[in-house]
Amino acid sequence: MKLVIFRSLMALFLITTMISCSSGKSGNEVSNPSNSQTTPVATNVAATQGKIQFKTEGGTELFALKQEADGAKLVDGKNQELARIKADKSGKIKIKNAAEKVLGYVVNENGEWKLKDANQSQDLYIFRTQNNGGYTLEDAAKKEVYRIQATKDGFEIATPDNKSVYQVKVKEGKISLRKTPTKTIFSTKSQLSPIAFTCFGFDVLTREQQAGLAYAVNLTGGK
């Protein structure tokens, strides 16, 4: 009789254990889908990085930087691709045209950004910080092309003899490039540091070079 009772208890124990394991497995299967949703969330964040649009005072789009996961794409007002800007494995910013031809590089070293040729054999321009809080753009011979000084509401781009070229004005979330206080060349309401925006006022550079330099400067906030 005792043997029969013992066998009954063992059978009941085994059944209870099997049910418990089965329930645990079901719980895990239910929780897995919620864990797999973490990756799409990160993807969605990257996907919301929209366009940095540069518009005339009348609202016409002149050009834009389309932010991508590994860089940016420069397009004109008709959404035609002009250049691709990407950081390579070494941290250099590579500038290519729509046909994948390398146009140049931007290298950030110790508070200066060097615009190099496609072969990386020559420094074309150097954008560097100054001890007074300003910046300079120099050519390959290290001769000043522009002086950039901070103002109460942005920056001023001037020649080496201090003749004003452009003013960069920051007001109510809008950054404007102005020839005079009343003449706006273009502006943006997109997220871009004012000093990075200033690079688009360097007329000695091509638009592709301006965009590559602005992208590199924006990554570090101009530091």
Regions found by a protein language model. Give the residues of each.
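Bacterial N-terminal signal peptides that target proteins for export
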Residues: M1-L9
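C-terminal motif of bacterial Sec signal peptides marking the signal peptidase cleavage site
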Residues: T17-S20
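Intrinsically disordered, low-complexity proline/glycine-rich segments
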Residues: G24-K223
